[in-house]
Amino acid sequence: MASGVQVADEVCRIFYDMKVRKCSTPEEVKKRKKAVIFCLSPDKKCIIVEEGKEILVGDVGVTVTDPFKHFVEMLPEKDCRYALYDASFETKESKKEELMFFLWAPEQAPLKSKMIYASSKDAIKKKFQGIKHECQANGPEDLNRACIAEKLGGSLVVAFEGSPV
């Protein structure tokens, strides 16, 4: 079911910048986004970047000790959101970084909000071509490291964001 909600150009630009890794100077790498949260505009017609709801690679280890925990804490308790998270994880063979797309729809969110976010998900997913991992979370229990490791590769994943799973 389509909702007719549009996706802002800035959302598409952020996705492209997170997906495409260019050769960058250390300063440019620090400005790369680790996580970004998206919301509906006040008129509910467009998916936009939620102001102030991002983690930069340069923040990790400086102002943010655990990027995934910080990301989860940025999500509202009583409303829905979309998010992109640049997951760093290790398998038994190698270290990897892959983008994850999240639909956050907590139980306490208003029914109308859950409906519009669910029906608008396809619009944003069409813009996010090449996402390997998608996760719908309905509460904090869906966002623990073990659940995320399962989405990233199950028993092959041995560490997520530097912590064993």
UniProtKB/Swiss-Prot annotation:
Function: Actin-depolymerizing protein. Severs actin filaments (F-actin) and binds to actin monomers (G-actin). Acts in a pH-independent manner.
Similarity section: Belongs to the actin-binding proteins ADF family.
Protein keywords: Acetylation, Actin-binding
Protein name: Destrin
Extent of motif Nuclear localization signal: 30-34
Cellular component GO terms, alphabetical: actin cytoskeleton; cytoplasm
Annotated ADF-H domain residues: 4-153
SUPFAM superfamilies reported in the protein's UniProt record: Actin depolymerizing proteins
Modified residues (N-acetylalanine): A2
SMART domains: ADF
Any GO BP annotation: actin filament fragmentation
Gene designation: DSTN
Molecular function via GO: actin filament binding
